[in-house]
């Protein structure tokens, strides 16, 4: 992916408006213009850590959400760009 196409894709994150991951109290990832916001990510006393990675083309991105807790969790959802850390 070229820098130009990456900028174009990130600046137009209108394909997906919201994505939600729920576990141990739940975490909600809501997408703004170019941002991802975390809400209630530390419910149940768990420690959450989110990191983003991009794949595909156009407005398709792979957002990988990982958090460490007593049970452990690893998932990925399609969403626009950004990174969120909650503890």
Swiss-Prot record:
Belongs to the hssA/B family. PANTHER family: HSSA/B-LIKE PROTEIN 1-RELATED-RELATED, HSSA_B-LIKE PROTEIN 1-RELATED. It comes from the Eukaryota. Pfam families: Coiled. Transmembrane segments: none annotated. This is HssA/B-like protein 54. InterPro entries: HssA/B-like_chaperone, HssA/B-related. GO terms for biological process: sorocarp development. The lineage of its organism: Eukaryota, Amoebozoa, Evosea, Eumycetozoa, Dictyostelia.
């Amino acid at each position: 992916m070229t820098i130009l196409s990456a900028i174009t894709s990130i600046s137009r994150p209108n394909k997906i408006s919201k994505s939600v991951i729920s576990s141990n109290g739940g975490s909600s990832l809501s997408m703004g213009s170019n941002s991802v916001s975390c809400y209630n990510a530390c419910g149940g006393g768990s420690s959450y850590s989110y990191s983003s990675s991009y794949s595909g083309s156009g407005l398709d991105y792979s957002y990988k959400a990982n958090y460490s807790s007593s049970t452990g969790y690893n998932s990925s959802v399609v969403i626009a760009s950004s990174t969120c850390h909650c503890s």
